[in-house]
Amino acid sequence: MSKEQLKKYGTTFHFASQFLSAKHIESAANLYAICRQIDDIADTSDDKEQAKHDLLVLKQALIDEDASHPIVEAAKSIEPAICLETLVELTDGVLSDTGSVRLHSEPELMRYCYQVAGTVGLLMCDLFEITNPIARHHAVDLGVAMQLTNICRDVLEDAENGRVYLPETLIGPMSASEVAGATGANADRIRDVVNYLLTEADVRYESGVSGLCFLPTQPRLAILVAALSYREIGMIVADRGFDIWAGRAFTSKTQKLLIAFKGVMTFFFSRRLHVYQGAHDSSLHRGLLRRPGVHWA
């Protein structure tokens, strides 16, 4: 993946990557390209049955470590090596996006967030050669936090495409069209749930940041800036009163510069970014079952 493609398709990642070394940028960009290709199978195909078939073929190729599949070949060429089992989990998560989506429960939502984003945290650990189980638990939390932010930002866009990630147990039996056009009590309920999920994301951002001390110095700063950037999107949604119908939340260039400044200041003056000061909360992984990087207690 070229730097221009990275800038176009992964703006937050491109911004944070400015704090990485050239070696880490190349590896991370190649990993991003693989994740993007997997995601695009579900998102860009008009034939959802064909997309599902292609993802199932990819999943089996990953399980078999069959390098004749171009995505598996690309994954196996990344150095340091990444875990193909983690990519299987990612592919399973993307498979659930082939068609309409209606999540029933909060544990189901958290499993989805783990599969499509917690796995990315684990793959980044692979790139930085982080094997400490505690560090990897925190990496899962950061990925889940970012995905919860994405979901809260994109409620309207997803609903217009037949996807509702807000759990039925929280918002009630609303259809995608009812979410997109919600008014009155239904709109209030959606705002309350978005507020709740962003609060859950904040807990996981805190956990994710507390695990950054396990990373090498340069990646530590880069991932901190990425975390602050995503978290800022949630703050923008909150500042709008959790009005998900008010347009897509994004950070301006000025906000990005302020985030970078905050990241650098935090990096230099926050002890927890350099010394591990706590223990991982296994309750954050409740319902994720026995999967790579999950804190099973």
Model-found features: residue ranges?
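Catalytic cores of Mg2+-dependent Asp-rich isoprenoid enzymes
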Residues: M1-M146, C152, E157-A297
